[in-house]
Amino acid sequence: MDSSKTKTSSSAAWRIGLGAGVAGAMLVALKYALRPPTRRRVPDAISPTAFATKVVPTGLGEVVYHEAGRGRPLIFIHNIGLGASSYEWARVYPAFADGWRVIAPDLVGFGESSRPNVAFEPPDYVQMLAEFIRAIECSEAPVIIASGLSAGLCVQLAVQHPALVARLILHMPNGTGDCGQHRLTWFSRFIYRLPLLARFLFRNHLSTRAAVAHWLRKAIFVDSALVTEEIIDVFATCAQQPGAEFAAVRWMGGGLRLDLDTALNAVARPVALTWGGEGAPDAEETSRRLQRLAAAASLTVFPSAGIMLAREAPEEMIAALREQLRDDLRVILKAG
């Protein structure tokens, strides 16, 4: 046999074997990287000890919520984002338990609630919120306090199910999914629409303690010195729960975007807006524009605050909410 042919054949076989070996190693590595993470216990700090933790089923999954107090129902809805949960409001909502029935749920896909492998859409969350409010058997329509993208979802809830909402108090609502200084660019939306890559990036980078801490300090909190170890622990643990990537990746891929302007223009319930002056580059312009869209909406601006006002300056948020919730507050319903 020709020795040159033998060498060529051996070289080709070696390359094929090497390629197969590399491909196999990559598949093993990818399989390892995409393993469901080990379930970690969510820190007790996620809710005050005086609040009972309860669970109700919805069509999207089980909703875990914290409740205390008696009176008119007052529901606090956390923003949608990395490691999000009802912990966002945990320094605020206890202040209202002496005169209200205070309820703080984790949205499905976040916190301690179910985290199904579902391609979430805004209508799914609107329906989930409607089912949740019906399931907790409110004596009357609740006042809803919400932030960010979740605030936008609550506006849609009020438009589609007006009997389930008495009033909306919205902190920096949006329909884009932008969170604080974190912007969802077209490139990030493209990357996070690739399921395997998105899950890989989320599990092995974005949900790590270091990445969560960086995100909180650089994008979410105006004063990074206020990002405590407890805050990092709760956000990182929630981000690392099995299945936490499904809703988060959907959010980062732009799958939860909604038309906030149209919804605000159609809402027939009283709306109050609170805004952080440091929360976004165009904060003042955006807040004024949204105020004009919602009939008779009030606007309270916190010049040195951002999207996480409820944790950075809870006393200021509590004071603003008390002002909005006064019994003698005059509200004007939109005609029709």
Q: Which sequence ranges carry the predicted segments?
A:
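Hydrophobic alpha-helical topogenic segments used for membrane insertion/localization
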Residues: 9-35
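A short loop-to-beta-strand scaffold at the N-terminal edge of the catalytic core in hydrolase folds
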Residues: 58-68
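Conserved HGGG/HGGXW glycine-rich cap/lid loop of the alpha/beta-hydrolase fold
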Residues: 67-112
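Active-site loop/oxyanion-hole signature of alpha/beta-hydrolase fold enzymes
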Residues: 90, 103-145, 310, 319
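Flexible "cap/lid" loop of the alpha/beta hydrolase fold
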Residues: 159, 167-199
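Conserved alpha/beta-hydrolase catalytic His-Asp/Glu region
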Residues: 179-181, 204-265
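Conserved loop-alpha-helix segment in the C-terminal half of the alpha/beta-hydrolase fold
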Residues: 266-305
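Catalytic active-site module of serine/aspartate enzymes centered on a nucleophile-bearing elbow/loop
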Residues: 295-336
